[in-house]
């Protein structure tokens, strides 16, 4: 069956957006690599924002220069950028396989005028691809602003990047659709095909990778936002450190509640975020161990450690709750038994219309042959 003109228009537009998506992916992979080498247009190494060995938790910020606060250092920032690149690379491979799967399925499995648009909705809508392109563009701007040491502009850019990542992950899992409509769309996926593998196997894996990356992005956003706040107001550096950790705790708690109350309806296995939260806690513990003397001298090592451990235990407990709900408390699927077919014989019954000739209507009888013979005699 041929697709409708609107379906073909969506199909062609989707492919053009994918081409732009792949171009943006190449650029987002090139910028961090180019920014790591001197002489390529970037004035400073973006991973080393400030000298954190000079951090003083008991002083207030000083105007006209950058006051060091808690932030990711070179190894942690490099690890975060590497994780982001790997997830974006996985997403690019996913969309490539999704496009290939739709091209192959288009030859034999188009059964309605809107089949192509339904498949595209299951793989990734044009809006979702556009949000993914904006994500990769903002991470490039973030690296460029960091290389110029513009902490305020970098915090603003990363705020946009974080909001786009939040929206992208939520839309990727739920697709902003009713659950029953997604069940209908899933029935339109041809079984035992590449499209079936992409939608039901590769897509959940990519969703968990994006959740893992979102857990790290919450940490980077908290540190960037509070560093900009700390260098804008006359406050103690220790207050900025506590503010960043507590903001990260609030974001993690919010996403845990959103997951258990809403997202699990669409995808039950969402363990990637909790793993990202645990890695984020390790990123916070590294400077606490690296500059232990500074934190001990300010009598802040124990309070900061307790706050970080609260996030660690929250992620661990949430992961255990999710596993328990998946295994023990998940509703069992109803069991169906095939209905035994009986001998059904159709009979024609005359119905007299009050304002016209008699109407013939088909009836059904599942009784034995004796009843049918009696009806024929009558």
UniProtKB/Swiss-Prot annotation:
<feature type="transmembrane region" description="Helical">
    <location>
        <begin position="151"/>
        <end position="171"/>
    </location>
</feature>
<comment type="function">
    <text>Envelope glycoprotein important for virion assembly and egress. Plays a role in the correct incorporation of gH-gL into virion membrane. Directs the glycoprotein N (gN) to the host trans-Golgi network.</text>
</comment>
<feature type="topological domain" description="Intravirion">
    <location>
        <begin position="325"/>
        <end position="378"/>
    </location>
</feature>
<dbReference type="GO" id="GO:0044201">
    <property type="term" value="C:host cell nuclear inner membrane"/>
</dbReference>
<keyword id="KW-1043">Host membrane</keyword>
<feature type="topological domain" description="Intravirion">
    <location>
        <begin position="1"/>
        <end position="16"/>
    </location>
</feature>
<feature type="topological domain" description="Virion surface">
    <location>
        <begin position="140"/>
        <end position="150"/>
    </location>
</feature>
<comment type="subunit">
    <text>Interacts (via N-terminus) with gN (via N-terminus). The gM-gN heterodimer forms the gCII complex.</text>
</comment>
<dbReference type="Pfam" id="PF01528">
    <property type="entry name" value="Herpes_glycop"/>
</dbReference>
<keyword id="KW-0261">Viral envelope protein</keyword>
<feature type="topological domain" description="Intravirion">
    <location>
        <begin position="106"/>
        <end position="118"/>
    </location>
</feature>
<keyword id="KW-1039">Host endosome</keyword>
<feature type="transmembrane region" description="Helical">
    <location>
        <begin position="240"/>
        <end position="260"/>
    </location>
</feature>
<feature type="compositionally biased region" description="Acidic residues">
    <location>
        <begin position="363"/>
        <end position="378"/>
    </location>
</feature>
<feature type="topological domain" description="Virion surface">
    <location>
        <begin position="290"/>
        <end position="303"/>
    </location>
</feature>
<keyword id="KW-1040">Host Golgi apparatus</keyword>
<keyword id="KW-1015">Disulfide bond</keyword>
<keyword id="KW-1133">Transmembrane helix</keyword>
<keyword id="KW-0472">Membrane</keyword>
<dbReference type="GO" id="GO:0044175">
    <property type="term" value="C:host cell endosome membrane"/>
</dbReference>
<feature type="transmembrane region" description="Helical">
    <location>
        <begin position="269"/>
        <end position="289"/>
    </location>
</feature>
<keyword id="KW-0812">Transmembrane</keyword>
<comment type="similarity">
    <text>Belongs to the herpesviridae glycoprotein M family.</text>
</comment>
<protein>
    <recommendedName>
        <fullName>Envelope glycoprotein M</fullName>
    </recommendedName>
</protein>
<dbReference type="GO" id="GO:0019031">
    <property type="term" value="C:viral envelope"/>
</dbReference>
<keyword id="KW-0325">Glycoprotein</keyword>
<feature type="transmembrane region" description="Helical">
    <location>
        <begin position="85"/>
        <end position="105"/>
    </location>
</feature>
<dbReference type="GO" id="GO:0055036">
    <property type="term" value="C:virion membrane"/>
</dbReference>
<dbReference type="GO" id="GO:0044177">
    <property type="term" value="C:host cell Golgi apparatus"/>
</dbReference>
<feature type="topological domain" description="Intravirion">
    <location>
        <begin position="172"/>
        <end position="210"/>
    </location>
</feature>
<feature type="topological domain" description="Virion surface">
    <location>
        <begin position="38"/>
        <end position="84"/>
    </location>
</feature>
<feature type="topological domain" description="Intravirion">
    <location>
        <begin position="261"/>
        <end position="268"/>
    </location>
</feature>
<dbReference type="InterPro" id="IPR000785">
    <property type="entry name" value="Herpes_glycop_M"/>
</dbReference>
<feature type="transmembrane region" description="Helical">
    <location>
        <begin position="119"/>
        <end position="139"/>
    </location>
</feature>
<feature type="region of interest" description="Disordered">
    <location>
        <begin position="347"/>
        <end position="378"/>
    </location>
</feature>
<feature type="transmembrane region" description="Helical">
    <location>
        <begin position="17"/>
        <end position="37"/>
    </location>
</feature>
<feature type="transmembrane region" description="Helical">
    <location>
        <begin position="211"/>
        <end position="231"/>
    </location>
</feature>
<feature type="topological domain" description="Virion surface">
    <location>
        <begin position="232"/>
        <end position="239"/>
    </location>
</feature>
<keyword id="KW-0946">Virion</keyword>
<feature type="transmembrane region" description="Helical">
    <location>
        <begin position="304"/>
        <end position="324"/>
    </location>
</feature>
<keyword id="KW-1048">Host nucleus</keyword>
<dbReference type="GO" id="GO:0016020">
    <property type="term" value="C:membrane"/>
</dbReference>
């Amino acid at each position: 069956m041929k697709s409708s003109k609107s379906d073909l228009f969506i199909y062609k537009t989707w492919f053009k957006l994918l081409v732009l998506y792949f171009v943006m992916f190449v650029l987002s992979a090139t910028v961090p690599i180019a920014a790591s080498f001197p002489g390529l247009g970037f004035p400073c190494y973006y991973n080393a924002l400030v000298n954190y060995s000079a951090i003083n938790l008991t002083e207030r910020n000083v105007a006209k220069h950058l006051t060091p606060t808690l932030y990711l250092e070179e190894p942690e920032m490099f690890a975060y950028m590497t994780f982001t690149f790997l997830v974006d690379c996985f997403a690019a491979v996913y969309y490539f396989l999704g496009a290939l799967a739709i091209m192959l399925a288009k030859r034999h499995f188009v059964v309605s005028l809107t089949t192509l648009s339904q498949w595209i909705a299951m793989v990734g809508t044009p809006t979702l691809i556009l949000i993914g392109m904006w994500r990769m563009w903002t991470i490039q701007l973030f690296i460029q602003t960091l290389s110029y040491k513009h902490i305020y502009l970098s915090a603003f850019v990363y705020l946009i990047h974080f909001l786009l990542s939040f929206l992208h992950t939520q839309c990727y899992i739920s697709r902003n659709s009713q659950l029953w409509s997604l069940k209908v769309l899933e029935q339109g996926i041809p079984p035992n095909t590449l499209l079936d593998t992409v939608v039901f196997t590769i897509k959940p894996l990519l969703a968990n990778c994006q959740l893992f990356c979102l857990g790290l992005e919450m940490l980077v956003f908290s540190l960037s936002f509070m560093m900009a706040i700390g260098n804008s107001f006359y406050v103690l550096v220790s207050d900025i450190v506590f503010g960043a950790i507590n903001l990260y705790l609030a974001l993690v708690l919010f996403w845990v509640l959103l997951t258990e109350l809403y997202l699990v309806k669409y995808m039950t296995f969402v363990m990637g975020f909790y793993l990202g939260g645990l890695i984020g806690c390790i990123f916070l513990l590294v400077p606490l161990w690296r500059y232990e003397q500074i934190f001990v001298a300010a009598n802040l090592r124990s309070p900061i450690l307790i706050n970080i451990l609260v996030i660690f235990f929250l992620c661990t407990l949430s992961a255990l709750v999710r596993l328990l709900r998946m295994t023990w408390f998940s509703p069992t699927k109803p069991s169906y038994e095939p209905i035994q077919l009986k001998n059904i014989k159709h009979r024609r019954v005359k119905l007299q219309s009050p304002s016209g000739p008699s109407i013939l209507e088909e009836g059904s009888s599942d009784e034995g042959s004796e009843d049918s013979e009696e009806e024929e005699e009558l």
